[in-house]
């Protein structure tokens, strides 16, 4: 049997290396340019690499173990926190739509990446110092304590959502508009933000209990 390997000159075309497409939130906003300015919160405000998603929905995979929520994308944590008060429980589609509309409003008003505005708002809204109760039932006093980074993020998200919810109650403005205003004011550090006012109040009480 003749060996035909030498006569056949087959050249396989090398497939061009294709780069993975950049993941953009809602197909609009890049997550690679987002920067967490507070070094203590870098590990607790996940936005890049594994946390980059097209939609803020992971089907509850971050609730299986304690503290796993620290790895949950920050935009999804915002959407989850909006599902508060019994009438809103489980309405994830509604809260994702609210977040999307709020981000579009933020982009129109500021021209900045809305995810960066959210990250700045979380950094500015998390209290660095709080007070706790020390002592038995008879003699109880309050003592100032430092706040852990994860709790700072938790409280910041809760305060931002509470502020937006209370502003939208019995108001002509939609909750998406109120959430956009709250995030913009908190990112600037403005006292018009509910979250900034509450954070300053907590830190003032803690300072008096040092």
UniProtKB/Swiss-Prot annotation:
InterPro entries: Ribosomal_uS7, Ribosomal_uS7_CS, Ribosomal_uS7_dom, Ribosomal_uS7_dom_sf, Ribosomal_uS7_euk/arc. One of its GO terms (cellular component) is cytosolic small ribosomal subunit. Gene3D superfamilies: Ribosomal protein S7 domain. CDD domains: uS7_Eukaryote. The keyword Ribonucleoprotein applies. Coiled coil: none annotated. The keyword Ribosomal protein applies. It comes from the Eukaryota. SUPFAM superfamilies: Ribosomal protein S7. GO terms for molecular function: mRNA binding; rRNA binding; structural constituent of ribosome. Component of the small ribosomal subunit. The ribosome is a large ribonucleoprotein complex responsible for the synthesis of proteins in the cell. Part of the small subunit (SSU) processome, first precursor of the small eukaryotic ribosomal subunit. During the assembly of the SSU processome in the nucleolus, many ribosome biogenesis factors, an RNA chaperone and ribosomal proteins associate with the nascent pre-rRNA and work in concert to generate RNA folding, modifications, rearrangements and cleavage as well as targeted degradation of pre-ribosomal RNA by the RNA exosome. Component of the small ribosomal subunit. Part of the small subunit (SSU) processome, composed of more than 70 proteins and the RNA chaperone small nucleolar RNA (snoRNA) U3. This is Small ribosomal subunit protein uS7. The gene is rps-5.
